[in-house]
């Protein structure tokens, strides 16, 4: 998924909360036309809307991630991770993956002595970014597919 054209312009203005009316004025668009685009972004989970006096629209964490990256792959990576077993290891790994916008769809953990082998299927992450994110926590990380 790439962020280009009008979608990119809209998302660039949504780093901070803003009303549809204010955003439409900035983009020189009719608010009703903009509202249609905002609803699509909301349905994709890229923006959140809030009604009322202090309402408006702004990017979600996922929307900010997509805008920053400019493109995400909707494919999955299967990872094999080897690490020294310790309390909180899996929580540490999964929270780091979550912080870079990854979504874990499958987890299998095997223990061999004082080491664990963890197999993860992860969506929405770049293979180099995930390796950099986990390098100080694990002994070895392999991309299986």
UniProtKB/Swiss-Prot annotation:
Transmembrane segments: none annotated. One of its GO terms (molecular function) is DNA-binding transcription factor activity. GO terms for biological process: regulation of DNA-templated transcription. Residues 78-145 form the ACT domain. One of its GO terms (cellular component) is cytosol. InterPro entries: ACT-like_dom_sf, ACT_dom, TR_Rrf2-type_CS, Tscrpt_reg_Rrf2, WH-like_DNA-bd_sf, WH_DNA-bd_sf. This is Uncharacterized protein MJ0241. It comes from Methanocaldococcus jannaschii (strain ATCC 43067 / DSM 2661 / JAL-1 / JCM 10045 / NBRC 100440) (Methanococcus jannaschii).
